[in-house]
Regions:
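Small/polar (Gly/Ser/Thr/Ala-rich) solvent-exposed segments
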Residues: 81, 101-125, 135-164, 168, ...
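Transmembrane beta-barrel architecture of outer-membrane proteins
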Residues: 66-68, 82, 127-131, 175, ...
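Membrane-embedded beta-strand positions in outer-membrane beta-barrel channels/transporters
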Residues: 70, 129-133, 177, 276, ...
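Terminal intrinsically disordered/low-complexity segments used for targeting and assembly
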Residues: 3-8, 14-75, 236-281, 454-461
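Membrane-embedded segments
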Residues: 76, 81-93
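Short segments within alpha-helical structural elements
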Residues: 198, 227-255, 303, 398-456
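Periplasmic alpha-helical coiled-coil/stalk elements that build and connect Gram-negative outer-membrane
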Residues: 21, 144, 153, 160-275, ...
Length: 461
């Protein structure tokens, strides 16, 4: 036992002089540039203490039918369920790492029979051993500590990655839902246009039959009318495609998706994006990058710890009747041993592992910086898209009003023989185009607002 204490004392002295760094803790990245979102006036005006990212997805998306779809997706989506499984695996790894401080205990009983020739006959002799072996690696040089901290970082990383998958899932369902609403609106416009243009076509045919119009006018009018018919077919096909895409996200078979209509949907006039410091705590992909850097940090610590000696305590507690092993058969055996293993030459593997670990840590640091930059860029882009859609919205509304009046007036002039069919066709097609564009712009505004919500870190709660 005296030798054991000498070994431990020498190791502690080695640690005191050289091993301080291997116990260092990772310091999370907590600062970012105040200009991460950009410096334009619109960006600065949108910054406030509050942010739409603090809203839960249920508070942000208030449509009950959309909420129902998102709930179903969160419960059933296979990618999200796989992310949950990864979290459970990391939890198991962390639990095992925490138990690494404890000694390992093995029990390996054995029994046998030997036969001896005694006075002309074989005499069997039964032997047995009941050894209980204990091995304990002392964690003087933070091998287990760094493994535990690394496992904790991996767990946090997988939890944040689950949040990334969830936020992207919420975004995908919401955007596909808005696309369905857009297509429904476009189909509504086309069906209404179909009925109006059919009346115009019948009017033109009547004029032709009475000799007041040329067949060319009828053919041109019918061509425009049939073009609307083909657009109706295309939109209905796109509706089915979007419904199928939502079904895949929900992990269900293709079926009809219930949704509400846009009605009098209005784009928000003001959006709060919060301050840049909130981005680090809100965005799960930034947290993934931070914990990946933390994992690399503890890998480097472990690579450093591999240069230090390994101290093991071994014990044996046994009971047996093997006279060849135990001087006093049937007695108790107790044995203790301490060992120190100091790596001297490992074919350059230890130095190579340390260098690789340092380079990996540097690479993770670069990826973290790029992740933050990408996040700020996404916020800037989404905010710009929101503002463009809001600005164009008033123009499209006015354009539809003007063209509606132009279409009505031109049609009346044609009925009175004061306008040609070309003027009517131009007015009809311009009005249809403006109505379709107005609906598409509303969708672009909704899509941009959803993208901004996700870019700021929303959707995971």
């Amino acid at each position: 036992m005296k030798r054991v204490f000498i070994i431990i004392a020498v190791s502690v002295m080695c640690f005191a002089f050289t091993g301080c760094k291997i116990y260092n803790k990772y310091k999370s990245q907590s600062q970012t540039s105040p200009e991460i979102y950009g410096t334009s006036e619109d960006v600065m005006a949108a910054q406030a203490d509050s942010s739409i990212a603090t809203l839960s997805w249920r508070e942000f998306f208030t449509d009950p039918l959309l909420q129902k779809l998102i709930d179903s997706a969160i419960a059933r989506n296979t990618d999200l369920n796989s992310a949950r499984i990864a979290v459970e695996q990391s939890q198991a790894s962390l639990k095992a790492a925490k138990l690494g401080y404890l000694p390992s205990v093995t029990f390996a009983p054995s029994a046998g029979v030997n036969s001896f020739l005694n006075e002309g006959s074989l005499q069997p002799t039964w032997t047995y051993n009941l050894p209980l072996q204990i091995n304990w690696d002392l964690d003087l040089f933070a091998v287990n500590t760094n493994q535990k901290r690394k496992a904790q970082a991996v767990l946090w990383q997988t939890e944040a990655r689950e949040q990334v998958v969830k936020a992207n899932l919420v975004s995908s369902v919401a955007q596909q839902y808005c696309m369905l609403q857009l297509l429904d609106r476009q189909l509504e416009i086309l069906l209404f246009t179909d009925s109006l243009w059919n009346l115009s076509l019948e009017t033109q045919r009547s004029l032709w039959e009475n000799g007041k119009a040329y067949s060319t006018a009828v053919n041109q009018m019918e061509n425009s009318y049939l073009n609307v018919k083909t657009q109706i077919v295309d939109v209905r096909r796109r509706i089915r495609g979007v419904e199928n895409a939502i079904c895949k996200l929900l992990a269900i078979t293709p079926q009809h998706i219930d949704r509400s209509s846009w009605n009098s949907y209005e784009l928000p006039q003001r959006i709060s994006i919060g301050v840049p410091a909130q981005l680090l705590s809100n965005r799960p992909d930034i947290q993934v990058a931070d914990h990946a850097l933390e994992e690399a940090f503890y890998n480097t610590q472990a690579a450093r710890a591999a240069f230090y000696p390994k101290i093991s305590l071994q014990g044996l507690l046994g009971w047996g009747n093997n006279s060849g092993m135990i001087p006093n058969p049937g007695a108790l055996l107790l044995n203790a041993l301490a060992s120190l293993t100091q790596p001297i030459f490992a074919q350059g593997k230890l130095r190579a592992n340390l260098k690789i670990s340092k380079l990996t840590q540097e690479d993770m640091a670069q990826k973290y910086v790029q992740t933050v930059i990408n996040a700020g860029n996404q916020v800037n882009e989404a905010l710009a898209d929101c503002q463009v859609a809001r600005e164009k919205d008033s123009y499209y509304k006015r354009q539809v009003e003007v063209l509606q009046d132009a279409y009505t007036g031109t049609h009346e002039l044609m009925d009175n023989g004061k306008a040609s069919y070309l003027e009517v066709l131009t007015a009809q097609e311009s009005l249809l185009s403006a109505q379709i564009n107005e609906a598409a712009n509303l969708y672009e505004g909704s899509r941009a607002l959803i993208a901004l919500y996700i870019a700021l870190g929303g959707g995971a709660k």
